[in-house]
Amino acid sequence: MVPRFCEVALAVPLRTTFTYAVPDSLAEVVVAGSRVVVPFRNRALVGVALGLTDRQPEVEQIKEIVEVLDPIPALPPRLIELGCWVASYYLAPPGEVFRAMLPPVVELRHERELRLTVSGREYLEELAALANRSEAEVAEHALLQLSEVEGKPIRSDRLGKLPGGPAAAARLLRRGQLEARGVTRHRRTRTQKIVAWNIEAPMEVQSMAKSQAKPQTAREAEERIRHVLTDERGPLPMRLLLGEAGVTPATVERLAKLGKLRVWEEPLAVEEDLFEAGFTLPTNVLNEEQKRALAEIQAWVDAGAFTVGLLYGVTGSGKTEVYLRAVEMALARGRTALILVPEIALTLWVGRLCRAWFGARLNDGVAVLHSALPDVERAREWWRVRRGEARVVVGTRSAVFAPLENLGLVIVDEEQESSYKQEETPRYHGRDTAIVRAKLESAVAVLGSATPSLESFHHAREGKYRLLQLETRVENRPLARVEVVDLREEFRRTHRFGSASEALRAAMSERLESGTQSLVLINRRGYSWFVLCRGCGAAVQCENCSISLTYHKRRERLVCHYCGYSRRVPKTCPKCESEHVYFFGEGAEQLEERLREEFPGARIARLDRDTARTKREYQRVLGAFAAGKLDILVGTQMVAKGHDFQRVTLVGVVAADTSLALPDFRAAERTFQLLTQVAGRAGRGELPGVVLVETYYPEHYAIQLAARQDYRAFFEKELHFRRLMHYPPFTALANVIVRDRKVENAVRWSRQLAGFFAPQESHGIKVLGPAAAPLARLRREYRFQFLLKAPRRAQLTRALAAGLDFCARKQIPESAVIVDVDPVSLF
């Protein structure tokens, strides 16, 4: 019997699937994994067909599937299994999970078309003969006549433009003089506005614009736009210009009308690769450690059985070449390969590396997938993979769902990185999901890192993972020498507070004289951390979040790095109106400015989310640094990992201990990892490297052991702390947040949930909270937090699922409760 019903996962925030009837016309094309268009309430949604059945649901009226989008199922069977696992493990709505797995769909509009019926045409003739018509009849005549004259259906979105149109249409439909039919339309390719400073504007236009009297704010806005649109950076997308210059679209339009700006539209498209200079392939000579690791991986791939290996290798030990050769082996055996990297920026480098390494052998068989690609390009790459045209995929977290078939090898580079964890629904972990995918595919998963997460290294020690080790750098190059600079002693000696110690400045001066490069890490964006009033002690806060605003000098704005809110810098304190406002702390922007003052002849650039808002800008800066066109690169943590700069002999770490103050049990681990990773950027070429770590807390074990680059000692010490405090890997952990814009709702719901969780203590589950979250207000929502610890994963899952069911019974909105399983951040 032909299945007549289909279970469909829809991208709605509900932990359930929906049943639809399969019409006879689609019976042969609706299969598990198909993307289907279905009616949902008053709109059309794209969903995934999960399974077919001929069992009659217990619902009287079943809506039908409208359309099948693709000639072949979008998701192969193993990916459907993986999606169901993600939804179950992370307690996520199935539809949200499958939406994350699918390529961007050309957006749909569900409209009604109104057609003239036979009786409608007769009624139109009657109305035409009337000398005097009522107001309702006038509206009905206009609507019917429009349909008759145009000779085609009227779209429902045009009714609002006709006087009395919606009401007239309702009457005509009720009387059968119009008929309605649902239509699904595809939206056009997305475009973006590009803005450039018009250097070719006639002189009379420029002088006229200058002579016109303008308010101070208008002149300031124009200067900020001129500053942002420099010749060096070139044209910018409108959205980036508005953010960086802190101006409105109206300001841009005014300057465009004056001829000072040029504005045009172009499709969102992939930008060209600017990583030409400084790009080198790894050496072809493997050392003995690399050969042993590769032989192990080859044996696992040949066995065709699920295996997880942890490749622990010090920075510069040649893990990348092991990855590439392992992929070669998998391809030679007819399997496909997936390489995950933690940052979008690294996909550019690794993708180009793979294309250069495999060259014509794969005939353009390398695909790059990440969320920053324009929808059209991402869909194109995704379907190349699905059709089997690409056999190697490089991507970030979301690429774990790439539709590769016959998968043989999954590589997770820098597996410890928190960016593998999705911070929005569905809150899956890319590394752990990759391991489960490898299990479903009987494939090999290789996790690589110089600073493995405690959980992964613990699993390797316990025998759950196989441990591979690279303990020496390629060509036996020494690790960089690390020196700790005690900023307390520096302050006592110089009475100077700020970044870039005397030792660091002297070391940079030496590198400038020798012609080598310096890399300076400061993990703070902006110019100053916040603005403080010396009169009342208040800091200028975000209107939407319980966080201080960061000062960005280039934009002359105070900015919230959580919600994007910004405001002008106040001349007086908003709280007490004191004029004594003080800019506290030093960020990457200020450090760059000070280094330019200190070394006026040096070629200095900054790389952070403010200067590298597009792929082009990111590539331009890194490409210039790799090619030796820059002397000093200042950056946030995006410069700390994965890059191979042969001429860097000095790495400076400014304010190395700021992350230690965070209220998070992983704070020490993150600090150790960041310092070790950035230290690994020095001395990767033939010249030895030096690392200077500036800190006010030099005795902390994370600082001390990072300076010694002693991962095993750090692992033992941190593991002891985790065991004492019952944190992972010794317990299963979940973070539950209750949120709402009304604080009374958030308080009431969190108390109700606390009442439900209280009895769970008797089942061995430790419940901490509710308490105000560390970020108590975010995007105008008040947030209260629970932390649940359980000795076994199954216990925790049952308790969380029961808690969500309790919320549904108490009519607590699903959107008000966030469940984060295996959280990497407690914010």
Predicted regions and their residues:
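Inter-lobe coupling/hinge segments of SF2-like helicase ATPases
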Residues: 280-287, 291-295, 304-747, 754-755, ...
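C-terminal effector/interaction modules appended to NTPase cores
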Residues: 779-781
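A generic structural motif
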Residues: 13-15, 25, 44, 537, ...
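Short beta-strand
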Residues: 767-769, 819
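Accessory, non-ATPase domains that flank or precede helicase/AAA+ motor cores in DNA-metabolism machines
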Residues: 1-449, 456, 461-477, 760, ...
